Amino acid sequence: MDIFRILSRGAALKRSSNSDPGVKSESQNATKDKQNSLLRQVEKETDFFNTRKHTEVTKDIEDEAQDEAVPPPKITTEEDAAKLRKQNKVNVSGTDIPLPIGSFEDLIARCNLNRKLLANLIASGYSEPTAIQCEAIPASAEGRDLIACAPTGSGKTLAYLIPMAQALISSPKTKNYGIRGVVIAPTNELAIQIYQTLAPMCRGSNLNVTLLSKQVASKISSSIISANKFDVLICTPLRLIDLVKKEQVDLSKVEHLVIDEADKLFDHGFVEQTDEILSHCTLPTRRTSMFSATIPSGVEEMANSIMKDQIRIIVGHKEGASTSIDQKLVFTGNEEGKLLAIRQMVQQGEFKPPIIIFLQSIPRAKALFHELIYDKLNVEVIHAERTPKQREEAIRRFKNGDAWVLITTDVLARGVDFKGVNLVINYDVPQTSQAYVHRIGRTGRGGKEGKAVTFFTKEDKLAIKPVLNVMKQSGCHEGYSEWMESMEKLTKKEKQQIKQHEIKRKKISTVPQVVSKKRKQRKEMIEASKRRKEETK
């Protein structure tokens, strides 16, 4: 797609929408020089790679840009839409559903997409919309509430950021008007990633976005800066609630509210915080969007209670994993067998970095970290007991390739995008199918292939059933033994039992084999010395 041709077309679109093409008004003639100046400025600002000379925009080029019409959208009929949805395995429900888009270029004609926003998208490497973006962007652009479910790594973040940014940029307010957009995420790591996606998109626009980090929250709390200077706030729930209760953040003007990882934010431990935020977002015309890779029926019921005239978008299965992930269940017998399985994978060349390993608790994550350190593997660890700075440093080292393996708990299972993760290992079986989908979603992102291996022991006979169901839905029938085909689904009581009670597991040995051997040798030497002393008496 030629960004420079598209940006030129934008001028023609604006002119035709505001005037009669057959009549030139005095105001048009008076502003012609100004338009030429703006076109020259756009030429300069969109020369991202310094390959284009900033020359004078001649009359011939201007006339060509003005006369060239924007091509019609790729999707123009319900038949086109049905064909695209079938191809992308998308199910959309609701009333008066907008047609999907077939390309980002369609947004120029259908939504009058801001030229600077489009230029920034192209500069960031986005070329064609994904399945969720094709549906969610036009629906959001028309001001509809959304419940959207799509596999991990399918581009959900961009699906809600583009329409929010477009809406806010195209209707600017006075300086220090107040917060107009809020994106809530369950973890700090995910909030950082969302900010890092939005900030480059809004570069050069009138939109002021910020991440509500500890430092920013402290400055707002101390009245060093005013929260009203920001248009969009990206945050975790508790930090926002703290400032709202102190009356230092006003959410009454929020026009766009996005709840990312909605299943987590409406689960126990978060639902009260989410409700608190919703109660302060009082603007009657507020648009609410909820996105996640898994949306259980209970969460959907709560979502329906706070939305109006919403559209429901499901890409693939409602609780399914990406089909680009090769999933496998490995029986290890016992806890010791898990360590042996990892060492065997290393010996057989299956342990190909970058790799993420998930465990069920912080003590177990620490223990495995020390075990693999003494196995001379290049590893890092992230869990809730580490400081934000330590966690950021661990993520930085992993992304840069300084660490090959990242050991973590479910704190890192949601939303965080790591490019090119080859393998995810579930050292401990997750407690729910949702947790499993989010964990393995760290690989196979953006359509790339990935691999996920889940270790299980005889204690996991119930816990592996939800994992097995996800594997069947994803078509990974070769990843488990034939006898598992006949396993019955969990009862409601069994699901609650697994979710509420962690499986008690034996402690992972943190004593490396070499240290254990030296200790044994020393003990034998001491005992031999004692015997010699006894014999000489």
UniProtKB/Swiss-Prot annotation:
Domain of life: Eukaryota
EC numbers for this chain: 3.6.4.13
Domain spans labelled Helicase ATP-binding: 137-313
Bias-annotated ranges (Polar residues): 15-30
Family matches, as PANTHER family: ATP-DEPENDENT RNA HELICASE RHLE-RELATED, RNA HELICASE
Short name of any one Pfam family annotated for the protein: Helicase_C
Keyword hit for Nucleotide-binding: yes
Motif interval(s): Q motif: 106-134
Protein name as it appears in the record: ATP-dependent RNA helicase ROK1
UniProt feature, compositional bias: Basic and acidic residues: 31-47, 523-537
Localization in the cell: Nucleus, Nucleolus
